Design a protein with these regions (language model features):
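Non-catalytic, usually N-terminal nucleic-acid engagement modules in DNA/RNA processing proteins
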Residues: 1-127
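SIR2/sirtuin NAD+-dependent deacylase catalytic core
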Residues: 125-129, 135, 151-153
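Short beta-strand/loop segments at the ligand-binding rim of alpha/beta enzyme cores
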Residues: 58-63, 132-140
Length: 153
């Protein structure tokens, strides 16, 4: 499956010389859209509105928690706010990434303790989320490179 992540270029030139928006091409081709809850919320909400008005649109919306972006800025993502947002748009979204924990601090080498703690924290978030969202089967658990494979069982 091909997934179009982010907003990308705003215009595309078709072979016949006409211009159209890249968003329109994605809609026509049915590309799944991966958009970050906080960083791309405007674009995400536009897609939600479009999907509600055009149920025939084959595009699958996938929502990322924005955990990595928040981590790079030294910020925290509020889990309950994310759940509240999920519950407002779950009717047109295909999947939601759980709110995962990135070990350590951006720009620093994480400790073995931080690396061990992060997947446990992520798993607790996942369990909390599936108890509090309207759509538990749409929540994707996240596994990071370097984490113990026991978290995949």
């Amino acid at each position: 499956m091909m997934v179009a992540a982010g907003t990308g270029p705003t215009n595309a030139l078709l072979p016949d010389g006409t211009k159209t928006s890249a968003k329109e091409i994605k809609k026509l081709l049915g590309y799944p859209q991966l958009l970050a809850w906080q960083n791309e919320q405007k674009e995400l909400l536009e897609w939600v509105e479009y999907k509600r008005k055009h149920s025939e649109c084959p595009c699958k919306l996938i929502v990322d928690s924005s955990a990595y972006s928040a981590w790079t800025r030294g910020l925290e993502v509020n889990l309950d706010e994310y759940i509240e947002f999920i519950n407002k748009i779950e009717d047109v979204v295909y999947w939601f990434a759980e709110l995962d924990k990135i070990p350590g601090k951006f720009g620093e080498i994480h400790t073995p303790e931080e690396l061990a703690e992060a997947p446990e924290f992520s798993w607790r978030n996942y369990l909390y989320m599936i108890e509090h969202v309207k759509c538990p089967k749409k929540i994707l658990p996240i596994f990071h490179q370097g984490e113990d494979f026991k978290y995949l069982r």
